[in-house]
């Protein structure tokens, strides 16, 4: 019997430089949530936090959820993810992808994801702003899609640079600071599912 807290399918790669993907399949494949871990992070996340997230989202919304690891690699990881979704039948002409990325995964989503119009909304959590700062700000300024939300813990190293994003804040591009939270959102039993629901799936 399969563990209720496991992925329905796990896709590995025979090269360390390729992302791995954990998938839970929902009844609604028109909407798909893509979760991107931080640098070196696994698809399951520390203490299975992403695995818990995907099951809670699937159960609440009926959507399929894909979690991606984030290896140290030169490949275009968003293009790789789109290819994986297509292969699994999760990316069609009618698919709307909701993206949530953490740390380096948030930066990858911001820098590479806008090339894919199927990604309709972004939740970018604690991206390291000191890396590619001008490009991230330019993308935020020029973003014309449905929604791009930046979220920083008040004690994250990049929070002081979030003010540069505030300059471009508008209806479809928002910036939120979480008081007392660190880079990993690890304090006070933080509810990650609630954050995703309110900032991305609302």
What are these regions (language model features)?
Residues 48, 136-137, 159-168:
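Short alpha-helix in the alpha/beta-hydrolase fold that links the catalytic acid
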Residues 15-19, 25-67:
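Short, surface-exposed "cap/lid" segments of acyl-processing enzymes
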Residues 49, 71-92:
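Alpha/beta-hydrolase active-site loop
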Residues 123-132, 153:
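Active-site nucleophile loop of the alpha/beta-hydrolase fold
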Residues 143-144, 149-152:
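Short beta-strand/loop motif that positions the catalytic acidic residue
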Residues 100-109:
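Gly/Ala-rich beta-loop-alpha elbow adjacent to hydrolase catalytic centers
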Residues 131, 154-159, 183-184:
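Acidic catalytic loop of the alpha/beta-hydrolase fold
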Residues 181-191:
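Catalytic histidine-centered segment of alpha/beta-hydrolase-like enzymes
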């Amino acid at each position: 019997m399969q563990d209720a807290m496991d992925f329905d399918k796990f896709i590995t790669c025979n090269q360390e430089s390729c992302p791995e993907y954990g998938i839970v399949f929902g009844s609604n494949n028109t909407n798909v949530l893509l979760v991107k871990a931080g640098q070196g992070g696994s698809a399951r996340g520390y203490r299975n936090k992403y695995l818990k997230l995907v099951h809670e989202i699937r159960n609440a919304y009926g959507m399929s959820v894909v979690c991606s690891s984030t290896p140290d690699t030169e490949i275009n990881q968003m293009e790789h993810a789109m290819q994986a979704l297509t292969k699994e039948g999760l990316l069609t002409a009618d698919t709307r992808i909701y993206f949530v990325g953490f740390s380096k995964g948030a930066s990858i989503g911001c820098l590479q994801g806008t090339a894919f119009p199927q990604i309709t909304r972004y939740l970018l959590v604690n991206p390291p702003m000191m890396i590619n700062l001008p490009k991230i700000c330019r993308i935020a300024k020029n973003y014309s899609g449905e929604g791009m939300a930046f979220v920083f813990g008040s004690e994250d190293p990049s929070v002081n640079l979030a003010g540069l994003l505030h300059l471009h804040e508008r209806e479809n591009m928002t910036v939120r600071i979480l008081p007392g939270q660190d880079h990993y959102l690890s304090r006070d039993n933080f509810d990650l599912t609630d954050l995703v629901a309110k900032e991305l799936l609302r």
